[in-house]
């Protein structure tokens, strides 16, 4: 019941604030949810969930069925074929390292994804698990070899993500895969929002209520259009694929019992508990 009340308050607040947000156009909020053991996509209108025929990034339309927010459980808002991430995309996180000509890219897995209110699980042998607050891009069209100038036309919307990372594995393994792609290491949500000006949104993390990271996406080293274009030169992006676009500042380890919140301006709060 507490989680349901939090969901209602967050979604209502976003609805009320929507008219004042810096946007590219009409702002729409899409979720994926379960009700009576059936999963669906939906759009939030007037504080009600309107069920869609399929994922909004696949052209889903309203079925005519609605649900109350207190009768649903939120799921991760996308079901991607690929979970791609960008490293060192803020000067505040990169420090004095030499700037790369292109965005450094790595992969997480669809099995890394969890929804808001689910638990981030420490893998066996993990000792130093960190949060990373990030804006996440959700693709809306198949993109292959697109230009930077055209990239925004392939983006459906944005959401919040946590690029959870095991720092010891990240530092000592030959590749980042184990330290980045473990189960539950890609919290995503709570919703996909279209129409936001993703080039200038505030990204924050809070650990047990304390602000740990806070910076705007306008400070990206490689902007989102450049990231989408660069990835699409070698990898075909499909609707629903997600791209974690980098984290600001420094991070610290999380321990079981901690609550980590990732908030992206206009998107809402992604909240997860740490568990063994």
Residue ranges and their predicted role:
Residues 25-103, 196, 206, 210, ...:
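N-terminal non-catalytic cap/leader segment that marks the start of a structured domain
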Residues 99-116, 131, 261-265:
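Structural signature of FAD isoalloxazine-binding scaffolds in flavoprotein oxidoreductases
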Residues 73-75, 94-96, 120-129, 143-150, ...:
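A generic local secondary-structure boundary/capping motif
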């Amino acid at each position: 019941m507490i989680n349901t009340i939090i969901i209602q308050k967050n979604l209502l607040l976003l609805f009320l604030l929507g008219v004042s947000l810096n946007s590219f156009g009409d702002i729409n909020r899409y979720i994926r949810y379960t009700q009576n053991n059936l999963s669906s996509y939906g759009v939030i209108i007037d504080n009600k969930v309107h069920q869609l025929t399929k994922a909004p990034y696949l052209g889903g339309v309203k079925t005519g069925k609605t649900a109350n927010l207190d009768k649903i459980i939120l799921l991760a808002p996308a079901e991607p074929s690929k979970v791609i991430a960008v490293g060192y995309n803020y000067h505040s996180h990169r420090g004095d390292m030499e700037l790369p000509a292109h965005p450094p890219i790595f992969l997480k897995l669809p099995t890394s994804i969890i929804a808001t209110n689910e638990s981030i699980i420490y893998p066996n042998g993990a000792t130093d698990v960190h949060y990373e607050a990030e804006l996440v891009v959700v693709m809306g069209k198949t993109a292959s070899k697109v230009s930077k100038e055209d990239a925004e036309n392939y983006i459906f919307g944005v959401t919040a993500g946590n690029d959870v990372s095991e720092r010891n594995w990240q530092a000592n393994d030959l590749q980042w895969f184990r330290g980045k792609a473990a189960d539950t290491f890609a919290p995503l949500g709570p919703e996909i929002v279209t129409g936001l000006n993703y080039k200038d949104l505030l990204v924050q993390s809070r650990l047990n209520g304390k602000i740990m990271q806070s910076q705007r996406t306008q400070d990206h080293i490689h902007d989102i259009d450049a990231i989408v274009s660069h990835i699409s030169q070698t990898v075909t992006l499909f609707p629903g694929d997600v791209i974690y676009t980098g984290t600001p500042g420094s991070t610290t380890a999380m321990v079981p019992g901690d609550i980590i919140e990732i908030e992206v301006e206009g998107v809402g709060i992604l909240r997860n508990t740490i568990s063994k």
